[in-house]
């Protein structure tokens, strides 16, 4: 879905990154306890791996990929991440706690 949007806007597709998936799993789990771009330990979101992470989109409560991507595209800051030409890698992870789904999308260059 993200790549369809990027390509429709004249951008190259982002490629899956296993390394970014590791960071997105960490962030998805962290936001179940503190929904913020600040990590539960008080550090910035990108400190999971500052050598890889250059953009982040978070969401909670959406049940489908279409719903969460549509919500991100309706938000100027999240949309800017999805459409940033410099980003060429991406990973998205989800986790569910107490019936609520949390999403972490991490971008790299």
Residue ranges of predicted features:
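A short alpha-helix/helix-coil micro-patch that ends at or immediately precedes a cysteine
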Residues: 1-32
